[in-house]
From Swiss-Prot:
PROSITE patterns: RIBOSOMAL_L24 (PS01108)
GO (cellular component) term, any one: ribonucleoprotein complex
GO molecular function terms listed in the Swiss-Prot or TrEMBL record: RNA binding; structural constituent of ribosome
Origin superkingdom: Eukaryota
Name by which UniProt lists this protein: Large ribosomal subunit protein uL24m
Upper classification of the organism: Eukaryota, Metazoa, Ecdysozoa, Nematoda, Chromadorea
Family note: Belongs to the universal ribosomal protein uL24 family.
Gene responsible for this protein: mrpl-24
């Protein structure tokens, strides 16, 4: 009964779709430097004391991926300052909540979406979303909201001429600096999630016109494949889909120890003592 109910749960694209959804979470946390440096345990029942490289509450989110070279260097520098400030008992500038992560049910932006910029010199222009950042609730729009910056910092020290190019800057979704485009009239709109007709999946609809805003195919791209149906399984490393869907566990009204005893042919001849609950 529990399995059949789980199969009827509607699919939620706003939770599943992300470029790094197959990236190991432990690796992502290590690149953020938000893992414990040392854990002081065995405190006679008291909770463990954790000394972090950088406390998760003090992590500074960015529109870049945590594993990019520039971000890793920034995280390493911040963790070193964080640790040295703890050792010398000095003041450390902790993170202030400049922007909070939006709830999954409120997030409606994905790579490949057609959006309209609402602020800046490109106000009123439309473009496609290149990347999204859930931690900072920002998006990058292709060719819009740009500023002139160095292509490679410190290139003159290496004997390379300094080159400049237009770099896209993040636009905040929570501050409504960018909005989705309604496919009905190609005007900016807000969107919400609602169940489709069969009731098996949530879809995006415009709050103004009620038209569905389909999710672009680029939103399904991950670092492992471009489309899920085109993924090629690696023999010897990937578990075949048939083996994953095969049902091998049969629930029993028995404890783990009793199941092992049944498999090994061990018979219990002792009489259990009465148990009292307070």
């Amino acid at each position: 009964m529990l399995t059949s109910r789980a199969l009827r749960i509607p699919r939620k694209p706003f939770v599943d779709l992300d470029y790094a959804r197959h990236m190991p979470s432990a690796y992502v946390e290590r690149t953020k430097r938000t893992v414990p440096r040392k854990v002081f345990g065995d405190r006679f029942g008291a909770p463990d004391i954790k000394m972090y490289y950088v406390h998760p509450d003090d992590y500074v989110p960015s529109h870049r991926r945590p594993w990019e070279d520039k971000q890793i260097s920034s995280h390493l520098h911040r963790s070193d300052k964080y640790f040295s400030a703890q050792l010398s008992n000095q003041y450390f500038n902790l993170r202030r909540p400049k922007s909070e992560r939006m709830a999954d049910t409120e997030w409606t932006f994905f790579p490949g979406d057609l959006v309209q910029v609402m602020v800046g010199k490109d106000k009123g222009r439309q473009g496609l979303v290149l990347t999204t950042s859930r931690d900072s609730s920002d998006v990058i729009v292709d060719g819009l909201h740009t500023k002139l910056g160095e292509d490679m910092e410190g290139s003159e020290k290496l004997g390379v001429d300094k080159t400049l190019r237009w770099q896209e800057q993040p636009l905040s979704v929570s501050k409504k600096q960018v909005m989705l485009v309604d496919p009905n009239d190609e005007q900016p709109c807000e969107a919400r999630w609602q169940l489709n007709g069969p009731g098996d999946e949530y879809i995006r609809v415009s709050t103004r016109s009620g038209y569905e805003i389909p999710i672009p195919s680029q939103a399904k791209v991950t670092y492992e494949y471009l489309q899920p149906e085109n993924y090629i399984e690696v023999e010897g490393k990937d578990t075949p889909a048939d083996a994953v869907l095969e049902r091998t566990y049969m629930p029993k009204v028995a404890s783990f120890e009793q199941e092992i005893m049944e498999e090994m042919g061990i018979k219990e001849e002792r009489t259990p003592k009465p148990t009292f609950w307070y």
